[in-house]
């Protein structure tokens, strides 16, 4: 007996409560589970209620970490592959640093975009993105298309913070043909308090000892707009410590954007490098990779594996 739902006019009713969950033990060290439910809470009393004033599904994800569990064995990366494991500028790659390694990036460009990133590998095949923060600044989109999207996530006082993970599925380090990784992140713009989900399915191929390339389908999901995209990039070794990185991204939607980036990476060591780049992407953080601005910008990024 009783009601478990009310609408915006405080009309009470009964609604069925549902829940669907999926768990995956990736290896003895790391497990992931996700859940979709319209239940308001996890306690016996709140679990019978829908969320206030609505009956919408809620999404959750949990990570189980066992520090002393056995990890998936991967052969160590050689120095050339280790130098590309810091990824590109606007197109990521599928490599994951080995367990226990911290990945740090700092980025700034001539338009005032500023971003910082910290990731930690819980396993040889799973990296947790603990900190991905920054702001887009002085973006000129040259028109009003996608104006609501821009004002919601890239407005004048935006500050975006994000959290996510990167899961390695295939790797030549365990005799697969190429690297394949699933990466997802969630977060919001602190100024508008609006968030989005960003996912990508990253494929990295090592062609020979001086060339590797990436193909990365991407998807942006939000309450304002949702659309897909795809990124292409390559790593061209000019010398042992100097690399050219050309990149292209395009969104798949009405009024699609096509942006390009050209970067030059100097490696002080396989773990430390400096990127100089020229790009008309809105920025290096998630949504910025799929949007184009009117003017090209010069940027710099510092990369560390510790």
Question: Where are the model-predicted features located?
Answer:
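Primarily extracytoplasmic ectodomains and periplasmic/lumenal surface modules that are beta-strand-rich
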Residues: 124-127, 137
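Active-site cofactor/substrate anionic-group-binding motifs, chiefly glycine-
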Residues: 129-131
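Primarily recognizes Gram-negative and organellar outer-membrane beta-barrels
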Residues: 9-12, 82-84, 93, 245
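Outer-membrane beta-barrel initiation region
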Residues: 43, 52, 57, 66-121
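Outer-membrane beta-barrel translocator/channel fold
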Residues: 1-66, 135-168, 173-202, 206, ...
């Amino acid at each position: 007996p009783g009601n478990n739902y009310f609408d915006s006019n405080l009309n009470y009713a009964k609604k069925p409560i549902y829940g669907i969950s999926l768990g995956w033990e990736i290896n003895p060290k790391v497990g992931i589970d996700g859940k979709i439910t319209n239940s308001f809470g996890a306690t016996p009393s709140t679990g019978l209620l829908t969320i206030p004033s609505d009956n919408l599904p809620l999404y959750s994800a949990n990570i189980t970490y066992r520090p002393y569990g056995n990890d998936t064995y991967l052969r160590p990366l050689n120095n050339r592959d280790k130098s590309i494991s810091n990824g590109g500028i606007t197109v990521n790659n599928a490599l994951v640093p080995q367990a226990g390694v911290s990945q740090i990036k700092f980025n700034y460009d001539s338009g005032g975009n500023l971003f910082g990133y910290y990731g930690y590998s819980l396993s040889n095949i799973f990296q947790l993105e603990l900190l991905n923060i920054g702001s887009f600044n002085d973006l000129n989109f040259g028109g009003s298309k996608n104006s609501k999207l821009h004002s919601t996530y890239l407005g004048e006082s935006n500050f975006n913070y994000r959290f996510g993970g990167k899961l390695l599925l295939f790797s030549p380090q365990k005799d697969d043909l190429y690297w394949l990784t699933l990466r997802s992140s969630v977060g919001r713009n602190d100024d508008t308090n609006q968030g989005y989900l960003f996912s990508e399915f990253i494929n990295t191929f090592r062609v020979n000892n001086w060339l590797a390339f990436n193909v990365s389908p991407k998807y942006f999901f939000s309450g304002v707009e949702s659309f897909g995209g795809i990124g292409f990039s390559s790593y061209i070794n000019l010398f042992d410590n100097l690399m050219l990185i050309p990149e292209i991204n395009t969104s798949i939607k009405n009024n699609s954007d096509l942006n390009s980036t050209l970067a030059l990476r100097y490696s002080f060591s396989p773990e430390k490098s400096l990127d100089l780049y020229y790009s008309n992407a809105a920025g290096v953080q998630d949504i910025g990779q799929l949007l184009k601005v009117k003017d090209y910008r010069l940027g710099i990024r510092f990369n560390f594996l510790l």
